[in-house]
Amino acid sequence: MQAYRWTAERVLRELNSAPGGLSHKQAAARLAKHGENRLARKKGDSLWRRFMLQLSDPMILVLLAAAAVSAVLCVVHREFPADVLIIMTVVTVNAVLGVVQESKAEKAIAALQEMTPATSRVLRGGAECTVPSRTLVPGDVVLLSAGDRIPADCRVLESIGLRVEESALTGESQPVEKSAAPLPDDGQALPPSACSNLVFMGANVVYGRGRAVVIATGMDTQMGRIAHALNTAGQNATPLQKKLTQLSKILSLLVLAICAGIFALDVGRSLLAGGLTFSGALSTFMVAVSLAVAAIPEGLAAVVTIVLSIGVTKMSRRHAVIRRLTAVETLGCTQVICSDKTGTLTQNKMTVTARTGVPPEQLMTAMALCSDAHRAGDRMEGEPTEVALVQDAADLGLEKAALERQYPRVGELPFDSARKMMTTLHRTPEGVMQYTKGAPDVVLKRCTHTWQQGRAVPLTEDLRRRILDENRRMADRALRVLCAATRQYPSLPSARSPEALEQGLCYLGLVGMMDPVRPEAVEAIAACRQAGIRPVMITGDHRDTAAAIARQLGILEPEGEVLTGAQLSQMDDRALDDAVARCSVFARVQPNHKVRIVEAFHRQGAVTAMTGDGVNDAPAIQAADIGVGMGMTGTDVTKNVADMVLTDDNFATIVAAVEEGRRVYDNIRKSIQFLLSSNLAEVLTILVATLLGFTILEPVHLLWINLITDCFPALALGMEQGEPEIMRRRPRDPKDGIFAGGMGFDVAWQGLLVTAVTLLAYFSGLLLACPVQMDWAALVHITDPLAHKTGMTMAFFTLSMAEIYHSFNMRSRRASLFSMGQNGYLWGAMVLSLVLSTVVLYVPALAAAFDFVPLSGTAYGVSMALALAVIPVVELVKAVQRAVHR
């Protein structure tokens, strides 16, 4: 339906409606046919499906397979399935954590969506009534006035100075004047921003009043179409998700390969030695299972989830609701932030910033009286420009209500787009005072005098030229400029037409206004630049306005280029790729342009964030690697698709999110390096022992170390504060693997270091337990059960403590441990892990379950000394690395 091409009468006829609206019976029938006037939300996964999705990680699957094998063996041997219970517990806890965090975020977003208005004023059977907005149907006649939010897409039937702010849909910050006149038919479909006789769901009436007939509701509205596209769009994996998935696959393949290799080696050796028995094969298989348990960092998934959750909690305290855990990390590697202007970088509130002419009190008295904006409680209501004028007068001590009591309005000529002026008449002790405000070039043509030193003097051509020059200078600064003039009468004039009143005026002055930038946004953009992040402004506003605001913010250089939507439409993808490489400001853009810009950055390999509050931002927010919505002024559609919602609509929160994202990713890498070097040490320890023909650790020992000893320090590393240079370095390359920057090498040699001290501890235990002196070769083949248990106990305790002490090394990959501040969480984790590891050795029931023996003071001291050795060795290597990189 091209309702904007038809007359108001035809639109009503096509909708089978009338100027007095529908009857209640008609409305009920249409509601049953069309459904409620609400946007459909994307159906989320069920709780069970969410839980199962948490188990799809390859490492989790290998763990579940190991648990299944262990369960079968426990049944065969009639043993208590301790290994199985531990594995299943950690898998379940990790899955529950993920589901709980997602559910909390969804509830936060649902709460934000309750901020929308719920009722509308309509005509039903010719009578005005208030109905729930969700019950509106096509054909309903809606009554609109200043302060209302448009409840559905409507065709204007009557406009009395009706102006609507549509920035949520079009990105245009200035209110648009609406009329009932049909638009000419040139055969081309018009975009919403060009339809002056249509109003759209989600827009706000800022001035005047009118009537409109509903032409579309719910998902059939412009907002609904965008919501549908977003609900059906897929979700891209974040950089962290991709890296962890890749790491899981690599570890899983390595585990399977190592297990198969060890199993084949042992079976082959048994066959060569004289035969393979079932018990021998079973024993070999258990060694392979031990390796699987050792190689997989069971706590990794839970640690990553919890570290991300900690980041989410910290962000929520700083007014950011994270909808997806991994969004925190994605912000940390963001290279480009594409931001809408209105309401995001600016305050979405017109403010007077310049005045010229008569004294401010005299000028703003005229502007305030010649305005329809007014104070309602503690806020101003009305068209944004007039609100700015009335507020500026109030700031000068000139409250409009007091002015109107002193100079009551006795006549007016409302603003219209043809005259570009508004005139009001006010009674004064001397008679009647007229105030006129409007476009400077138009008002100035009606002026014959100017007010100087308390009296009217003729307006010379030279003075007129100087006033117009000042107008141009103000316009060049992206100010919206209005001119004020006056005229005095001894009594109320009988002829009150525009032609009679708006001539022979006396010029008072110019007032310049703009939607000011957020002060914190300037600092935030400077911080982004320091962090190597490129800020880009994408707006529906005029080119000159966008350029001026961008320069104030520091986004655009003095000679920088601004690209318009019209220019962008003429470009193919290759030309656009070149343009986004050099342009940081895009003006007069449509929603599809925003998506193309984001896609162009993607083709260049840039991790891109998109911030915004309007429906027009939503498709690009969906397309970006991370979408940032505004909680206070943002539309429901935008909040639904955003990865993160700023509850204070403060752009500066983005910088905090970037910093938090970088800190979280750094800490996740520290935790991963710690866990992998620890698990590598376990694998190498078992591998060496297997090759030499003895057993050093059982699967239950490894599970205890991985889940009890290692998890607490890994979590404490996730609480580490950001390093000093965190916001002075460039974003990391999203293509970098999890082991980038030499981390893979560090994992390898640190794993070897812990392996060495663990094996030394085992053989030290044998030596301490043997009643006679033995050489090292004999120790490998020792058969004394007590000596073996002592060696195994010392190996377990040394491995546990070495990993705990090694966690202190992981606080920074390059900085010395002794140059850093304190991490109380890590000290707490060390004490807790030390206590738990010691308890296992000395509580008889636990020691028996783990097949341990209590260690003597000497054995305990040797184990601690060997474990502590990892700190000076790593410190020495760090010192060498710092010297090399210096």
Model features per residue range: what roles?
Residues 79, 746-763:
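Alpha-helical transmembrane segments of multi-pass integral membrane proteins
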Residues 268-272, 759-776, 842-847:
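Membrane-helix interface motif
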Residues 275-282, 768-790, 847-854:
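Membrane-interfacial helical/loop segments at transmembrane boundaries in membrane proteins
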Residues 371, 605, 658, 662, ...:
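Alpha-helix capping/termination and helix-coil
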Residues 733-753, 782-794:
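Membrane-water interface at loop-to-transmembrane-helix junctions
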